[in-house]
Regions:
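Core of compact, soluble alpha-helical bundle domains
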Residues: 1-131
Length: 131
């Protein structure tokens, strides 16, 4: 079964973040550093992925800016993004197969790569970010 509806995205993202919260490499970032309010965060993530995967314009925030805020509290490193992408791919593979599921994994890899690149630039003092 492929990802075709918002309900599919809600299932994927809910299960994914259940894994994230328990992960020894990145769970603490969400639980302790950022103290994420999941009732608020999950619907935003549903919108984000619905925008990316189903071409519904639901997400209009600045995703990069939010991650710069996180990076200023704790330096986001390759190991963090590696855990994130590994969990995302594992969760997607457990739940879905098909063209959109493959696109979700590809987009997630691209997002992780760009985020890591941008965080590394900031951590090395190569950019001035005022977001």
């Amino acid at each position: 079964m492929d990802i075709t509806t918002r309900k599919d995205i809600e299932l994927l993202i809910t299960r994914f973040y259940e894994k994230v919260r328990q992960d020894s490499n990145i769970g603490f970032i969400f639980n302790d550093v950022m103290k994420v309010n999941w009732e608020e965060h999950l619907p935003v993530m549903f919108d984000f992925w619905e925008t990316i995967l189903l071409n519904e314009t639901k997400y209009t925030r600045n995703a990069m800016g939010i991650h710069f805020e996180v990076n200023r509290k704790i330096k986001l490193e390759e190991k963090h993004f590696a855990s994130w992408i590994q969990l995302f791919i594992k969760t997607t593979d457990e739940l879905f197969t098909g063209e959109t599921a493959e696109m979700a994994k590809k987009r997630a890899r691209s997002i992780a790569d760009v985020m890591l690149f941008k965080m590394n630039q900031e951590n090395e003092g190569l950019t001035i970010t005022k977001i």
